[in-house]
Amino acid sequence: MAEINLTAAFSTVPAAEGEALKQMLVDTIEQLAQEERKFSRAKVVFTESDERCGLTAELDGVKKEGIPLQLDLDLMEDAKTNSGARAQLKEEIRLYFRRVQGEAQ
């Protein structure tokens, strides 16, 4: 199982909802680690401010992508209960992680 260190900061999301979003992100990143088998440690920072979300990551000490992944808060909220939205979010994070590791898209 991958070691995931997620730091999250929310400005407009209530605390309970923020914790649910944080857990959903951790679960998604763990799934990607198991599926891709390309990293064992992930340091991830997620920020939400005025409903704008950004995610940055360092995977096994590698961070070749300096631009944060912009995520849609509505998509993230839908991903908690909707498998289609969850799959879309997971794919966005998967592609971002490949850029972080320096892989071509």
Give residue spans per PLM region.
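Negatively charged, low-complexity tracts enriched in Asp/Glu with abundant Ser/Thr
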Residues: 1-44, 82-84
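Intrinsically disordered, low-complexity regulatory segments enriched in Ser/Thr/Pro
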Residues: 2-13, 54-91
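Short, structured protein-protein interaction patches enriched in aromatics and acidic/basic residues
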Residues: 43-58
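C-terminal low-complexity, charged extensions that often adopt amphipathic alpha-helices
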Residues: 87-105
